[in-house]
Structures are given as C-alpha cells and as structure tokens.
Design a protein with these regions (language model features):
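Positively charged, low-complexity, intrinsically disordered RNA-binding extensions
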Residues: 161-263
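Short terminal hydrophobic/aromatic SLiMs and anchors at protein ends
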Residues: 9-18, 22
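N-terminal cationic and glycine-rich segments that engage phosphates or anionic surfaces
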Residues: 22-147, 152-161, 257
Length: 263
C-alpha cells in the first residue's frame, strides 16, 4: 500500500504504519468517522434510504438517463459500492419520474452542540417545516442550539472524495496529473485509489476519470472540519448523543461536527 501526499511519496512497511502516521490527515479522519457512523446504523437500510433520496433528487434535476446525468451515474456507482440491490436503484429512479413523486430538497442546517462543538447537518426533505422543527428539538434536548445559515459553515472545508481502480499505473505520475485537477490528498491502497479535492473540482475530476477509462467505485461530497475540539469522555458522550439523535432522523443525510476523533 502506498500513500502519496502532494509532492511526496512514502512507502510504509504496513497498512498499520500508514494509519498510525496519517490518522490526523483530513481524509483519514473522515474515513474513521464514516466507519463509525455505519457501525451505529447497524444495517444497510439507512444507507439505501439515503442513496435512494439522492437518486430521486438527481433524476428530477437532470433526467433518468445516467449517460446524460453525471450525478445520477456517480450515485449509481455509489449504490453498487454499498451493495444496494439494483431493484432498489431502479425503484428510486422510477419514483422520481412519477407525477406524485415527493419533491425532495437538499437543505443544510448549522448549529452548536454541547461544549461548543460546531455541527453541520445535511438533509434531503420533502417538508422543511417538519425537518427544521425536529432538528431544533434535537439540539435543544442535547444542550445545543440551532444557528443561522453561515454560523458554522466556515469551520468546515467542502471536499469531494473519489475512489477508483487504476491497475498498473505509476502512482507518482498519476499523482502529478491529478494535482493539476485540484487533488490535495492521494492514497494508493490495496483495493484502489482514493483522492480528495475541493468540492468545486468534483465535475472536472469525474470527467477526467471517465475520459481516462478508470473505473470509479464511488464519489461523494464531504465536509471536513478545519479545526477540532478535544473533549473528555463525558463530553464526548454528550456530543455523541446529539449525533445519534440527528442520524436517526429519516430526513438527515449526513452529520458533521468539530469534535476531535479519539486516539
């Protein structure tokens, strides 16, 4: 396994040594947080619901043909990576084309949780009044407060992350090519390559990967905190309670916060 940081290539002795050396990088911190979220959800139903809503939004915005709708195409690849049955994907596409289809909107909410930890909550909802009322209730019950738009958004970097397969490629040469596309973190792993870049580079990176013939495994938007806050065990528990409350809501797609990850 290789890890290539911009303008630098490091060949470690093992995967474990990579994790120890780079567990503070933006991308790796996001991966650890995502893994814990999946563990909390405990089953794939929540993941399928999330992807299904995103597919419906993409179809309404750009049509049901994945060859002409780049967002839909990447979501279908994400669904495959999560082992979402093909029938579920087809149903989501069909629902979006029906006359009485739910009109989902993507809305981001911002606020502060316990101990001044900043929260950014991404939702996909067909009823914003219901969603904002529920989210405000979760914040209030857990010792936090829902804020105004822009109140904490500046504390997070909006990034895109792609995972793709590129067998038989020189990682140093590939890294140099992708730097020109805006990539600032580059990982070569046993099952493929992961890259991170500013979200504005999403379309350019997806187009380039398609043109080069690389198999895209997944592509998504993420929010990564620019700074984090250390908390003791009791503080962490109170923040995790709010995270769990938010993630249990069917309208919530992603929850990001500025609490530091455990060592």
């Amino acid at each position: 396994m290789w890890v290539v940081m911009v303008n630098r290539v490091i060949v470690p002795d093992s995967i474990e040594s990579i994790n120890q050396k780079y567990n503070r990088t933006m991308g790796r911190a996001f991966e650890y947080r995502k893994a814990r979220k999946m563990k909390r959800w405990g089953h794939m139903a929540r993941v399928f619901t999330k992807i299904g809503k995103e597919i419906e939004i993409a179809v309404k915005a750009g049509g049901s043909d994945p060859s002409a709708n780049t967002r839909l195409r990447i979501l279908m690849q994400n669904a495959k990576a999560e082992n979402m049955p093909k029938e579920n994907v087809e149903r989501a596409i069909k629902r979006a084309t029906e006359k009485d289809a739910a009109d989902y909107k993507e809305v981001v909410y911002e606020g502060y949780g316990p101990h001044g930890v900043a929260f950014l909550v991404e939702t996909a909802t067909d009823n914003t009044n219901r969603t904002v009322a529920n989210i405000r209730m979760y914040f209030n019950k857990c010792g936090g407060a829902l804020g105004n738009s822009g109140s904490v958004g500046f504390m997070f970097e909006h990034k895109c992350v792609f995972k793709f397969k590129a067998e038989g490629v020189d990682p140093e040469e590939l890294e140099l090519e992708m730097i020109d596309l805006g990539v600032d973190e580059f990982y070569v792993e046993e099952d493929g390559i992961s890259v991170y870049a500013a979200y504005e580079s999403f379309g350019a990176i997806q187009k380039w990967l398609d043109e080069q013939g690389y198999e895209i495994v997944s592509g998504e938007s993420v929010r990564i905190p620019t700074d984090t806050k250390e908390l003791d065990a009791e503080g962490r528990e109170s923040v995790e309670r709010l995270v769990e409350k938010l993630e249990e809501d069917d309208d919530v797609v992603n929850v990001y916060h500025t609490m530091a990850e455990e060592e």
